[in-house]
Each structure stands twice: as structure tokens, then as C-alpha cells.
């Protein structure tokens, strides 16, 4: 991530080149008293406003976690399927939590975060229960929405590790009905 201080009109802004959604983007930090003026100037230049729903859709299509929904202080990078985010230089060193991480890499985890595609357009939201084909509860959805890029509903959640393979058939309980889905 790169960032810097810039002057826009008569005020200072701090801009970082980043993107929380998987898209190229910028994050702008600005004094509150200039925020409305800044947005008005962007709109004059042709910018389009979006809301949290768009951000959520983009991040889910990209498979990105939302802290508090998909990951939290009790979730390890291995459970969240984020081992790739641990530097290769660091993975074998000692750091807070390294013993747990190393044990999970060696022995596996009980639950793991997966992407899920319901077979219908029904949207499975957070806390939707996930069942196997024998009707045993095996996990929960953490986030779900409609993905316009794939023209289908999408979700992510945690399932017991032995159900995490691609194309594993499972069922989501949405409003009292079981909906077929696949990893």
C-alpha cells in the first residue's frame, strides 16, 4: 500500500492506493469540515457514489473477509484459509500465537472458511446453518449476498474441515427451508 499527503483545492488530504474490495481503489483521509466539499468536487468530476452494499458485494466476490463477520480475534489465519497471508520468512519463526499456527498447519483444523454457492438465487445471510447430506449441522454462513458479476447468490462461512473440498454438496437452512449449495 502506498500513500501520501496531497493538496486538493485549499485543503490537505492523505490518500492511500489500496482497495478493500479486490478492486483498484483509493482511501482518502480528510478533516471532517472539508469532507462534504471534497465529495461535491468528486461528483462534479463524474465520480459515482456507492454504498456499503456495493462494497460488501465486491469483497464477497473477491473472497475477502470482513472483520467481525468472517474473522475475529478468536479466528486463526489457518481456520480462515488465510495461510497465504503469513510471510514465508515469518511462518517458521516464533511470534505470538506461532505455536497454535504451527500445530494447525501440521495437524489441520476442525473448521475452515470456504466459499459457498447456493443452487438457487436465495441469499444465505450470516448465521445461516449449514448441513451435510445426512442433515448434520456442519457449520454456519458468516456473509452472503447476490453477486452481480456471477449473476448468482454467493456466501462464505465455516464448515467442518472434512466438508471443505470443492464441489462438496451441502444444504443451507434459509427461513426454515433447506437450500442445496456447493463449496
Where are the regions a protein language model picked out?
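Conserved, structured C-terminal
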Residues: 1-183
Amino acid at each position: 500500500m502506498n500513500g501520501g499527503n496531497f493538496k486538493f483545492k485549499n485543503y490537505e488530504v492523505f490518500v492511500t492506493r489500496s482497495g478493500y474490495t479486490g478492486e483498484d481503489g483509493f482511501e482518502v483521509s480528510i478533516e471532517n469540515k472539508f469532507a462534504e466539499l471534497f465529495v461535491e468536487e468528486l461528483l462534479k468530476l463524474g465520480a459515482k457514489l456507492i454504498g456499503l452494499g456495493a462494497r460488501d458485494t465486491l469483497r464477497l466476490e473477491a473472497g475477502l473477509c470482513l472483520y467481525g463477520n468472517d474473522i475475529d480475534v478468536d479466528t486463526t489465519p489457518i481456520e480462515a484459509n488465510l495461510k497465504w497471508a503469513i510471510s514465508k520468512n515469518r511462518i517458521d519463526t516464533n511470534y505470538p500465537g506461532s505455536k497454535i499456527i504451527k500445530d494447525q498447519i501440521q495437524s489441520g483444523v476442525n473448521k475452515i472458511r470456504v466459499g459457498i454457492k447456493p443452487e438457487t438465487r436465495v441469499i444465505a445471510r450470516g448465521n445461516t446453518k449449514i448441513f451435510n447430506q445426512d442433515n448434520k449441522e456442519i457449520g454456519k454462513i458468516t456473509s452472503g449476498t447476490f453477486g452481480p458479476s456471477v449473476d448468482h447468490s454467493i456466501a462464505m462461512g465455516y464448515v467442518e474441515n472434512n466438508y471443505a473440498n470443492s464441489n462438496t454438496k451441502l444444504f443451507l437452512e434459509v427461513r426454515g427451508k433447506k437450500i442445496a449449495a456447493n463449496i
